Amino acid sequence: MPLSHWACANCGFWQLHFDPPDCPVCTDVRNDLPEDGWRFLPESDVAQAHDGEARQVADDLWAFTTTPHLGLGGTGWLIVRSADEGGNIAFEAAPYYSAAMLDTLRDLGGIGRLAASHPHGYGALFQLQREFDPPVLAIQKDDLAYTKAFRVTAPYDDTLELGDGYTLHHTGAHYAGQAALHDAHAKRLFCGDMFKIDQDEAGRSTHVSSHKAFHKDIPLTHAELRQYRDVVAGLDFDAVLTPFEYAPEVGRDLALAILDDALSRPPQVRRFAL
């Protein structure tokens, strides 16, 4: 059987494999196992059954999502920049990109830099690399074990500049290699799963929390929270974006207050009310 791409029907994680025996994301403590056993979807089945949409969030920012829901259902963010600046930056990826979504990406100028925070945000990175062949696909080195579906061209240690004012920062904690992308120009922090944002039906953020494992309510240790704080304290931002939410209500000062509140208590998962 030749190598091909398969998506886990439970979490959406993609593998380049013969016939996957299991899913490394689901077998990890941070995610739930499928109740009815393993089921892996070949790319052709996913392509036939799924569509998606591209939504402009700001002048220079687009959000790509997949419908119907696939796996964890994350968002692929696209920061639009000129070719002179190094081209567009794609951070995280939607679970799958339809032909129409890929056409929209082409119309917006393609992808010059590609990166993601951690495995829950990888989505269909392999598709974006295959379609646009950006010179940089950056993943922090401690998460390389999860990257067999695509080829990492720019592993890094603590920080990596994707362009002037666009810097990846290693945060760890939730995953050993978790990283955040700071957009200094627009004052945004693409924070991965550093923060979980609860939102109401209107999309307003209501609570914020930090977890080692969201599904299992496993808290972070104080040392892990301090890792987050050390990164956040040095950055200027007015909004955070996770693989799942856009939270313009959460800026640097509030993020620090949330972390300081967590550090003032024994390790626990506490949803900080906004």
PLM features: residue spans?
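Active-site metal-binding motif and surrounding structural segment of the metallo-beta-lactamase
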Residues: 98-142
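A general structural motif
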Residues: 86, 110-111, 134, 236-238
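Short glycine-/acidic-enriched loop or helix-start segments at secondary-structure transitions
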Residues: 73, 101-102, 125-126, 200-201, ...
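N-terminal juxtadomain amphipathic helix
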Residues: 2-66
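Structural signal for conserved beta-strand scaffold positions within catalytic alpha/beta enzyme cores
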Residues: 63, 116, 138-139, 154-155, ...
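Metallo-beta-lactamase
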Residues: 2-22, 28-32, 45-59, 88-97, 126-273
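Conserved beta-strand hairpin/beta-sheet module of binuclear metal-dependent hydrolase folds
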Residues: 50-101, 179-193
